[in-house]
């Protein structure tokens, strides 16, 4: 009987060590810090991309509608860009041309609309809520105006949360294209109160 007690007591320190090992917090490391020099360098490279083009697949999903299209985004300057949505047959569903102070939208009937607010115009004409002003930054992998973001282990944007006027958008970066320099997103998803926007970038052209 005494022998069993001594054996039991000898096991207690070992068990305590095992429990302690299971509860030791794992450090996330410097990659998740927005103040890391690697992120700052990557961010500066992205901010210098004044002209670029990307094309791929677009999906807008909500309780009221589901829209699937091909998209083409052409940025010619920080304040000038063109967004084209086409159907599987290649016909234009929507073309948006944004310049400082004026936005022109052309629908699938060839009708033209002019406004100074591209996001509001698209929502009124199509029912889709697309945060275009922020999307210009997010599509490159930049957080834009939000300080609420995390990085992956390669010092790239992983997830962000953006709040404005009572509306919260959550953006998840699911994949990056490492064949271009700097690496740019190839798949991302935006979520806002039951609405989802999925973007898959098949190619990037940097000018």
Curated annotation (Swiss-Prot):
It is found in: Cell outer membrane. Keywords: Cell outer membrane, Chaperone, Lipoprotein, Membrane, Palmitate, Protein transport, Signal, Transport. Pfam families: LolB. A lipid is attached at residue 22 (N-palmitoyl cysteine). GO terms for cellular component: cell outer membrane. Residues 1-21 form the signal peptide. The keyword Chaperone applies. InterPro entries: LolA/LolB/LppX, OM_lipoprot_LolB. GO terms for biological process: lipoprotein localization to outer membrane; protein transport. It is a lipid-anchor. CDD domains: LolB. A lipid is attached at residue 22 (S-diacylglycerol cysteine). Its main location: membrane. Monomer. Belongs to the LolB family. NCBIfam families: lolB (TIGR00548). Plays a critical role in the incorporation of lipoproteins in the outer membrane after they are released by the LolA protein. This is Outer-membrane lipoprotein LolB.
């Amino acid at each position: 009987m005494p022998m069993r007690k001594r054996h039991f007591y000898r096991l207690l320190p070992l068990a305590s060590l095992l429990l302690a090992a299971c509860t030791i917090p794992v450090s996330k490391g410097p990659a998740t810090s927005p103040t890391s020099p690697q992120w700052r360098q990557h961010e500066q490279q992205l901010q210098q991309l004044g002209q670029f083009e990307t094309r791929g697949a677009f999906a807008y999903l909500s309780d009221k509608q589901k829209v699937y299209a091909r998209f083409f985004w052409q940025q010619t300057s920080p304040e000038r860009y063109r967004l084209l949505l086409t159907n599987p047959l290649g016909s234009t569903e929507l073309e948006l041309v944004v310049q400082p102070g004026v936005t022109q939208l052309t629908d699938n009937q060839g009708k033209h609309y002019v406004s100074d607010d591209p996001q509001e115009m698209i929502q009124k004409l199509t029912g889709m809520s697309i945060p275009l002003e922020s999307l210009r930054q997010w599509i490159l992998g930049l957080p834009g105006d939000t300080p609420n973001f995390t990085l992956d282990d390669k010092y790239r944007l992983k997830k962000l949360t953006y709040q404005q006027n009572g509306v919260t958008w959550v953006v998840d970066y699911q994949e990056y294209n490492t064949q271009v320099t700097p690496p740019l997103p190839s798949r991302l998803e935006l979520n806002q109160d039951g609405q989802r926007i999925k973007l898959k970038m098949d190619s990037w052209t940097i000018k």
